[in-house]
UniProtKB/Swiss-Prot annotation:
GO cellular component: cytosolic large ribosomal subunit
SMART domains from the UniProt entry: Ribosomal_L14 (SM01374)
Protein name (database record): Large ribosomal subunit protein uL14
InterPro entries with a match to the protein in the record: Ribosomal_uL14, Ribosomal_uL14_arc, Ribosomal_uL14_CS, Ribosomal_uL14_sf
Function: Binds to 23S rRNA. Forms part of two intersubunit bridges in the 70S ribosome.
Keywords associated with the record: Ribonucleoprotein, Ribosomal protein, RNA-binding, rRNA-binding
One BP annotation, GO: translation
This protein's record includes keyword ATP-binding: no
Single GO term (MF): large ribosomal subunit rRNA binding
Length: 132
């Protein structure tokens, strides 16, 4: 996994409800854990743009509900700072469900994805229609 160019402020913590931006049948996801996070004692685990997280499906089709899956954060409301000084933030917090090879399980993505995510996950970038 590559390092990100931008200074990503982590805007999601464990327990956050986020939207699912693909067509797998899930509509709302709950963050249950963040892979690779090592924090301080008593600190809430946080995730940001381009992080791989474990989620539980809270709303969606009956086949998808209550499943525990892996996902990648593609949008967050909290602004991130790019090397040229610009700040980017999105209207919602969203993630894409991925498989064990970090390929998206859905065939299409709804809405834009951040350029930082496209650099780190090429398979998600090839599925996306808008890269900001």
């Amino acid at each position: 996994m590559e390092a990100l160019n931008a200074d990503v402020t982590q805007g999601l913590e464990k327990g956050s409800l986020i939207t699912c931006a693909d067509n797998t049948g899930a509509r709302e996801l709950k963050v249950t854990s963040i892979s690779g996070y090592s924090g301080t004692k008593n600190r809430h685990p946080k995730a940001g743009l381009g992080d791989k997280i474990t989620v539980s499906v809270t709303k969606g089709t009956p086949e998808m509900r209550r499943q525990v899956l892996e996902a990648v954060v593609i949008r967050q409301r909290k602004p991130i700072r790019r090397p040229d000084g610009t700040r980017v933030k999105f209207e919602d917090n969203a993630a894409v469900i991925v498989d064990e090879n970090e390929d998206p399980r859905g065939t299409e993505l709804k809405g834009p994805i951040a350029r930082e995510v496209a650099e780190r996950f090429g398979s998600i970038a090839s599925t996306a229609t808008i890269i900001v």
